[in-house]
Every structure is written in structure tokens, then in C-alpha cells.
Curated annotation (Swiss-Prot):
InterPro entries: P-loop_NTPase, Small_GTP-bd, Small_GTPase. Induction: By hydrogen peroxide and infection with an incompatible race of P.syringae and B.cinerea. This is Ras-related protein RABG3e. It is a lipid-anchor. NCBIfam families: small_GTP (TIGR00231). One of its GO terms (molecular function) is GTPase activity. The gene is RABG3E. A lipid is attached at residues 204, 206 (S-geranylgeranyl cysteine). Keywords: Cell membrane, GTP-binding, Lipoprotein, Membrane, Methylation, Nucleotide-binding, Prenylation, Protein transport, Transport. Plants overexpressing RABG3E exhibit accelerated endocytosis, increased tolerance to salt and osmotic stresses and reduced accumulation of reactive oxygen species during salt stress. GTP binds at residues 15-22, 63-67, 125-128, 158-159.
Length: 206
């Protein structure tokens, strides 16, 4: 039987503490939301199997701490990323202003081979808060920033009710595929365990 090819895509979610990174990840992977806030310590990740254009993908989504004292963990967690998601809270001007710092931090720590074309996606989260009346960062302003950084795709979401979360992660998956850095895992449908007396190699045929 033919083997199935599964591609591992590593996605990093960055942004200030409290913008909803963990909630976005849980809403997408588990379709769950909790009102109880618990800061991520260091980093955590979830995986989700995705079928796209007749290909099977495993998304490995890393949720990293937003506190500055954990930024030194960046090198270990950022390396090998296929897409970086920058998240801010539309009700927090500071979280939006800090996007540039997070972007620069990622590029320094991850050292992608082609930083000019590395795929980012920006998410403005918590559009549901107070029915939108608490919003301080306009969609126009956010889109202008994304345009200035090479036309980064932009989505506005509510991790609480799920608004645009699926669409955002579809874009994230698509952009991660284009990065060309994916690690492929081959999953044989059958494993032959009946081979006996294997021949030993006595040399290297290079």
C-alpha cells in the first residue's frame, strides 16, 4: 500500500501577555474557551492534523510567554518556525505598538534564511469585548502597519466566540507551506516486520 506523506509545520504565536494567544490556540485546536486567565510560563504547544489540497499536515502551534523575562527562551523555540503569528489586543494600544518589537525579536532569534520573505500573519484579537466599544486600535491603522511590513496578512478575531479563527489559521497554514522550511514525515501504511537475516553493509556506497 502507498505511504502517506505528512508534513510538519511549526507555527509560533507571539505577542504581549494577555492578548489571547493561548485562547486563540485552544479555540482553533480544541474549540474551547476559558474565561480564567492563566499566564503561559515559558512556552507550550498543541498539534492539529489538517488536510489541505489533498495533503496531510501536522500543525505544531507554539504559544510563548509574553513576559520579557522569558524572551531569552526564544532561540530554542523560534528556530525552525515556518510561520510567525503576531497577536495584539484591539483594546490595547500598547500591545499593538509592541508588534514591531516582537517581529524584530523573532527575526533576530529565529534567523530565517530569507527574512525579507518570511511569512508572518497578524491577528487583532478580542473584537468582542464590550461589543467593540472599548476598541482603541482601528482596523485601518492595523492594516496600514501590515502593509508597511510587506503586506502581512491581517485578521481580526474573537477567540471567545470563534470569529475568524478558522480563517486566520487557514491563512497561517497556507503561508507556512510556502516557507519551504517544512519537515516531512513519512507514514507507511504497513510495516514489514517479517524480514529475517538482514544483510550487513560492509561499506558505504556514496
Amino acid at each position: 500500500m502507498p505511504s502517506r506523506r505528512r508534513t510538519l509545520l511549526k507555527v509560533i504565536i507571539l505577542g504581549d501577555s494577555g492578548v489571547g494567544k493561548t485562547s486563540l490556540m485552544n479555540q482553533y485546536v480544541n474549540k474551547k474557551f476559558s474565561n480564567q486567565y492563566k499566564a503561559t510560563i515559558g512556552a507550550d504547544f498543541l498539534t492539529k492534523e489538517v488536510q489541505f489540497e489533498d495533503r496531510l499536515f501536522t500543525l505544531q502551534i507554539w504559544d510563548t510567554a509574553g513576559q520579557e523575562r522569558f524572551q531569552s527562551l526564544g532561540v530554542a523555540f523560534y528556530r525552525g518556525a515556518d510561520c510567525c503569528v503576531l497577536v495584539y489586543d484591539v483594546n490595547s494600544a500598547k500591545s499593538f505598538e509592541d508588534l514591531n518589537n516582537w517581529r524584530e525579536e523573532f527575526l533576530i532569534q529565529a534567523s530565517p534564511s530569507d527574512p525579507e520573505n518570511f511569512p508572518f500573519v497578524v491577528i487583532g484579537n478580542k473584537i468582542d469585548v464590550d461589543g467593540g466599544s472599548s476598541r482603541v486600535v482601528s482596523e485601518k491603522k492595523a492594516r496600514a502597519w501590515c502593509a508597511s511590513k510587506g503586506n502581512i496578512p491581517y485578521y481580526e478575531t474573537s477567540a471567545k466566540v470563534g470569529t475568524n479563527v478558522e480563517d486566520a489559521f487557514l491563512c497561517i497554514t497556507t503561508n507556512a507551506m510556502k516557507s519551504g522550511e517544512e519537515e516531512e514525515m513519512y507514514l507507511p501504511d504497513t510495516i514489514d516486520v517479517g524480514t529475517s537475516n538482514p544483510q550487513r553493509s560492509t561499506g558505504c556506497e556514496c
